[in-house]
């Protein structure tokens, strides 16, 4: 407990003499909450005083002389974030739909932005809905080129989760045709990639400051994960890759602290092609990622990154439930876990999130319902085990998007509750207008809550012909 002492000195002067009255009052005040005591730093401040010359009191009319000691408290810096146990629950339910183009009749600042590659990242107090825009809105006159992956107009934008990404709601963070973001507990880190295919550049922004860059190392479309990076104790880990979409593309991880790259991590193992990883914490020691191989296999490359040693290894998932699209029939690939099988050309980013429990861990995945097209989205789960060696099928856990609706990229993220983390999966539902009209997306969100079965799928409600 800290005593707060107030001393007051009052000096009274009269024409007949000097009357000195000294009053000292000491009182103890006790802080009611010990955590406040621990978090706040005391700082002493002393008021300036005037000197008093009493040699000739007859010349003094009236003087007040006081000295005050004041105790102030400085607000503490926010804490770095660490993964916690997941909030209780045994099933995912439909949480939210963000379908901007249901409001497509709006014009001007209320018009929805044309976007793709949405993802969500959360800090201790808020979640942000990110996307890559084509710097165009619907309705509007700039639809040409909105189906392109990379051009000079694309930007990383965000809105607070639950807001519609319109012109007036959106914050434009940086020029980018590939992106990521994460919160370390104190501040946001934003990642954007743009530039020519042969010499693209990663740019890092920490809060409002642009802080660092990273250059292409294979001169073939340097790109990042299109979902949230992951932070622990102030260190944030970002997956990047550089290489052919139909050949070798070796990934790396960047360790970033307060917006600056402090280490490069070069994974070992099955490294031929790894891109668009969806990553999360299996524990305080390990980040795991389910990734995309666009060249050789319909199995997902699975990364384990040790944050204590800053080492990473990649192997293919062994499950007979193949998670990429296009893909062969489940269980049809023979041989060891590292066998590629057929129908490995092409692919899609997949959703993946952890459910951390005291006695076990759940790994939740998403994949399209169609084996050949980006249609529908189903949820799967596997408790415990090792994705590198377990060949058993994943357990289906419900339909999030029916076969009649588009199911494109999907991603994982976690919402911070007061004492636990809520795992969620988001789904990009693309309005594919081809090259003749606008090309944009809605976002469906499913989160762990309660028990029972996943009850309802999501529709965008958008008719592009209107």
UniProtKB/Swiss-Prot annotation:
Residues 38-86 are annotated as: Hypervariable stalk region. Residues 35-466 are virion surface. Residues 13-35 are annotated as: Involved in apical transport and lipid raft association. It comes from the Viruses. Residues 89-466 are annotated as: Head of neuraminidase. The chain crosses the membrane at residues 12-34. InterPro entries: Glyco_hydro_34 (IPR001860), Sialidase_Influenza_A/B (IPR033654), Sialidase_sf (IPR036278). Glycans are attached at residues 56, 64, 144, 284. Inhibited by the neuraminidase inhibitors zanamivir (Relenza) and oseltamivir (Tamiflu). These drugs interfere with the release of progeny virus from infected cells and are effective against all influenza strains. Resistance to neuraminidase inhibitors is quite rare. Substrate binds at residues 116, 150, 275-276, 292, 374. N-glycosylated. Residues 1-11 are intravirion. It catalyses: Hydrolysis of alpha-(2->3)-, alpha-(2->6)-, alpha-(2->8)- glycosidic linkages of terminal sialic acid residues in oligosaccharides, glycoproteins, glycolipids, colominic acid and synthetic substrates. Homotetramer. Catalyzes the removal of terminal sialic acid residues from viral and cellular glycoconjugates. Cleaves off the terminal sialic acids on the glycosylated HA during virus budding to facilitate virus release. Additionally helps virus spread through the circulation by further removing sialic acids from the cell surface. These cleavages prevent self-aggregation and ensure the efficient spread of the progeny virus from cell to cell. Otherwise, infection would be limited to one round of replication. This is Neuraminidase. It comes from Influenza B virus (strain B/USSR/100/1983).
